[in-house]
Each structure stands twice: as structure tokens, then as C-alpha cells.
């Protein structure tokens, strides 16, 4: 039987170029750049990449991203919906974001499936801090990393989402199927009902999602 540790949905976060500053001239090119800047305002939604989001998992639906922060040249994005369900670590051992299998999965399987070669050119490799959890400050956060795709920290989740309600994340139908898979192949009707009767955001079921900060156990991470 798999443990509940495996059930939490990941939420991918990407720091990417909002505009390309190379070869910018006047006239129409400058107007295009200004339009791109206006598009990437904090609180707005943009699309980048594709990922399965229907129950069948056979689709390639455009991924919607919420703009968390933008300086006119780069923008920090978080996926509007939880796109998949993965364990933080495939082994129950003391682990940090630096070494966890979820980080590897995000920057390999997810990254390569979600983005085209052209889209990858716009995604920056980010310096990702290793922060302690203020509630469990004895937990080792590991070392800082460089990632194309990563998760928010506890501090960042509190910074960009001011309330518990704002931090609730809706789940795609495909991700719900992954939740069921990780729970048990023989999941019963009562458990399915529990999932379906959970909180809702944007008319969709909301579920817990991973942060990269250490959690209450050395083998896992914090979650929302």
C-alpha cells in the first residue's frame, strides 16, 4: 500500500523571458515588445507549452500560467492548475529539494514533455534558494540549485499568495487520475467521493501541492 506522502500534486514554476531584447529596433518591433511587456503583468494569465489535462491523458492542452512577478524582461510564472501527481521522493529516506526525485522529474520528464525546443529557449535557468522552514528550522534544506522548472518555497508561497484561499490550487482531470493511481490500484468508491467532494477553485477540485521547503519529516517537504 502506498502512503499518503505520495498523493500530493506538484505545481510547476518557471522563470522565463517575457521579451527578447536582442535586435530590438524602432517602429513595429518596439510596439511588439511593449505589447509583450503588457501581457506579462503580475496577476495576468499567459500560455506556454502543452501537457495532458483531460481524464484520458491523451491530449496536449496548452498550459496556463499565472504571472507572479515581472520586471519587463523576465517573468516568474506558476501553472494555473496542478498538472500532475508525483512523490517528492520515490524512497522513504532523508532528502532535500537538491536530491529529491521530484526535482529530477520536473527538469527532465516534465520539461521535455511540456515544452518545444523553441519554448525552451525562453525559459531561463534559475538560481533556486534552499530555505529553512521556520516551523521546522532544524530540518536541513540542502544546497541552492539551478533549475529550469522548480517549486515555490514556503516564503514564496506566502509572498505571492496572501491567504489560504488564494493558495488553493485547482487540479486538472489528468492529475486527478494520477492521484487515484498513487493512492491504490484498488481505490474504493468512498475515497473517490472524498476526492470529488474536496474544495473547489475555478469550478475544479482543489488538492494539496508540494513546496520545495523541508516539511515536518526529513523524508518529505512542506505542502499547501
Residue ranges, per PLM feature:
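Collagenous Gly-X-Y triple-helix signature in extracellular proteins
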Residues: 29-224
